Amino acid sequence: MKNWTRLAAAMFVCCIAAVSCSKGGEDPFLKIESQTTFSVAAENASGEIKISSNVAWTISGATKWCTPEVTSGSGSRTVALTITDNDTRNPRSATLTVASSQGKYAINVSQEGNMNLNFYEEGSYKAVEINRQSNAVNIVIMGDGFILDDLTDGGAYDQALDRAREAFFDIEPFRSYRDHFNVYYVYAESKQRGATYGYGYDGSTRQNFASAVRNTAFSAAFTQEANSTATSCDYQKVFNYARRVPVMKQGADIVLDSDGNPVSGAITDPDNIINKTVIILVINDQRYAGTCIMYGSGACIGMCPMSTSPGTMSFEATLRHEVGGHGFGRFADEYIYYDEALPSSGGSYNATNLAAWQGIGQYLNVSLANVTDQAPSNWQPFLADPETYPEVGFFEGACTYAKGIWRAEQNSIMNDNVRYFNGPQAYFIYRKIKTLSNETPSWEEFVANDAARIREQANANSATVQNALGAGEKFIPLAPPILIGMPQ
């Protein structure tokens, strides 16, 4: 009887198992029916993963260029892979992982390098914005620290220069008078991305600075201590690359000495077009830094890394300060470092040098006296009309010093990079644009078109600027400009 009972129980278990198997299918499993290693073409490629399973599974390891249509599921399914075109000459690979409770499989995808790409030739140029056939203000933009793969049509080089161009015009009065400008790009290949840290382009070293050398076209370098924003490059090479643009070819190639002083060539002729042109060097580095080198003849190079800092320390804000403010506007800084009077000599700013530069029409955003009839000429119409422009007056402190030097408004782009040129700054820029375009400026025209700039004034509030930086961040003023060719 006992044996019969045991036999019946065993038969019952077998029946249950059989029923279970017939209702639930086979044991849990996961298989990949397609290839687990495959290669695709550089363009117009696709792929798939054929999953055979009766359990839940996931797919991980997606990249920007190789993405599965789903990242999880259950049961059998063919998962399509989206594979973007390879826009470099270099092959690339990705590994996707299909995993479940029953194990995992690696799917290895490789893509060929693209041999069909067209790269800009070294030293070539492109006219990207032609608003005038004659009497235009010229802007030449080039990049440093961009390798050959970046130099495709619409590639990283073009995208960076596009950002620079739009940033320059994204402020009044440049926005309103954009149709007075022509813009050109010049292409240069670097062997490495980035910029040099801790060395000047001439190979000189700096102290207390983490050093890293990059082989770049224009030898852009961050040249001072770790907390400095000072920047340099091979100025002579930049000037002569700008001359690759046909309209810039007046005169002979430029020769500078080791300190950047003019020796010969176009830059020594005050009437040469190089001295009426804005040159922007976009540096392919994320550091917050930037410097403008300004020549007494009018030439300039604004050096701007592609800062990833927020707010008024961004790439765009830095470029507007360095290029629009220093380079085109020829303005002095308005921030304050020292709680003392502007010295008569020595340092980056002093009264003697300021007076000399103002004598040739530069640094007219600051005043050495707080007396109306001694203020720069571009201040005069504002001071004469306090009802229309009540914000303009004498505010002590500029050029890194708290006393003995005055700015025209409480705040402006030359203080903390805020997107706002104050009244006298904007009027100077307007007059320069009109003059370089062989047109006659007038106070009446400026006022008639000034409403858009006035609306930007609300952005000049320092509290608003600070809030835009984010919690715990403090605005860092940019290094003073480099002055070459001091007036005698």
Where are the language model's segments positioned?
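Surface-exposed binding patches on compact interaction domains or structured appendages
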Residues: 28-30, 52-80
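N-terminal low-structure segments adjacent to metalloprotease catalytic domains
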Residues: 22-25, 113-212, 423-488
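A short beta-strand micro-motif common to beta-rich folds, especially ectodomain repeats
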Residues: 90-102
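Active-site-proximal segment of zinc-dependent metalloprotease catalytic domains
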Residues: 120-135, 142-146, 166-338
